[in-house]
Amino acid sequence: QVSEFVVSSEKVPESFSGYRIAQISDLHNAQFGEDNAQLLELLESTHPDCIVLTGDLVDSRRTDVEVAVSFGEEAVKIAPVYYVSGNHEARFTEYEEVKAGVSDPSFQTGFPSDEPEEVLRWELDQVSSETDGYWILLSHRPEYFELYREFGVDLVFAGHAHGGQFRLPFVGGLMAPGQGFFPKYDDGLYTEAGTSMLVSRGVGNSLFPFRVNNRPEILVAELRSA
């Protein structure tokens, strides 16, 4: 499924009005057709100007790096790709191999804490003074939305929640990692105090091998100058 959203802001330059960003999240080594041909065909049909990958391309329980690498190699033929890792990449043994050779203009090491929220706060503090334009953040974790809002991020792309795994009519998602039962941020667009966050339901599964009322999705955001 392709889910499309329009995100408007007066900070979006006129030259970027209509810019399309396609998001893939939480692949978890899933394959849709041989070498993910079906997924890539659907991705290309969205006519993205760029593609963002928001973590967990692999699954730490059944890691197959080749599936993730192959998908990335084909995705960059469609449009420029920007990638942020998720908790499953961080847990598997080949993580250093995946990072090797990645060109990152602002790579940080030596974090002041082992707590994810404190590391994230420290990182946001490092970059918050570097931009006065429209600030787009890729973060695997949607549960830190209040922190993103505190730092004035304009648009966040997140995943991790798997759409709440089992979606109940009139209720929404049943549970999500990092948020527990009846998660607050599990699907779609959230906007508060000038910060918008798009949470993808993702395309793959991890601990639970199936979904209920919760189709895998490619999320597309079209930026508009307000």
What is each stretch, according to the model?
Residues 27-31, 58-62, 111-116, 134-135, ...:
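Short, flexible loop segments at the rims of nucleotide/cofactor-binding pockets, characterized by
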Residues 18-28, 100, 106-109, 113, ...:
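Active-site-proximal beta-strand elements of phosphoester/diester hydrolases
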Residues 1-11:
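N-terminal membrane-anchoring alpha-helices
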Residues 77-80, 133, 192-195:
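A short helix->loop->beta-strand "cap" motif at the edges of active sites that frequently abuts
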Residues 93-135, 145-146, 151, 208-212:
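Binuclear metal-dependent hydrolase catalytic cores centered on His/Asp/Glu-rich metal-binding motifs
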Residues 29, 57-60, 87-91, 108, ...:
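Solvent-exposed loop/turn segments at secondary-structure junctions
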Residues 136, 141-219:
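Conserved beta-sheet core of the metallophosphoesterase superfamily
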Residues 15-105:
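Membrane-embedded segments
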